[in-house]
From Swiss-Prot:
Residues covered by region (Framework-1): 1-23
Keyword Disulfide bond: yes
Gene Ontology CC entries for this record: immunoglobulin complex
UniProt-listed PANTHER family: IMMUNOGLOBULIN LIGHT CHAIN (PTHR23267)
Natural source organism: Mus musculus
Name of the protein in its database record: Ig kappa chain V-III region PC 3741/TEPC 111
Length: 111
């Protein structure tokens, strides 16, 4: 199975500042010219919400404050600027190889 390692596990950012979350895969998640890495936001009591698909594509309805980058094994989710509503846990997920796997999550808090 592909192991996804997120860092940091938790992050405290001031309102209006930038939050950066990293995800490293144990092997490449690239195929056919695409990176099959996705980012989700989860708030307590709610299902995960897709933010970014295939590394850098913004899901419909998601603010452009969210962006994703990376390829092969190293990926980044950036939130800039951070707003109060962004308090949540963020997960990376790969869909290049079965079983699809998630990172351990990064909890974002406001400083």
């Amino acid at each position: 199975d592909i192991v996804l390692t997120q860092s940091p596990a938790s992050l405290a950012v001031s309102l209006g500042q930038r939050a950066t979350i990293s995800c490293r895969a144990s092997e490449s998640v690239d195929s056919y010219g695409n990176s099959f890495m996705h980012w989700y936001q989860q708030k307590p009591g709610q299902p995960p919400k897709l933010l970014i698909y295939r590394a850098s594509n913004l899901e419909s309805g998601i603010p452009a404050r969210f962006s994703g980058s990376g390829s092969r094994t190293d990926f980044t989710l950036t939130i800039n600027p951070v707003e109060a509503d962004d308090v949540a846990t963020y997960y990376c997920q790969q869909s290049n190889e079965d079983p699809y796997t998630f990172g351990g999550g990064t909890k974002l808090e406001i400083k």
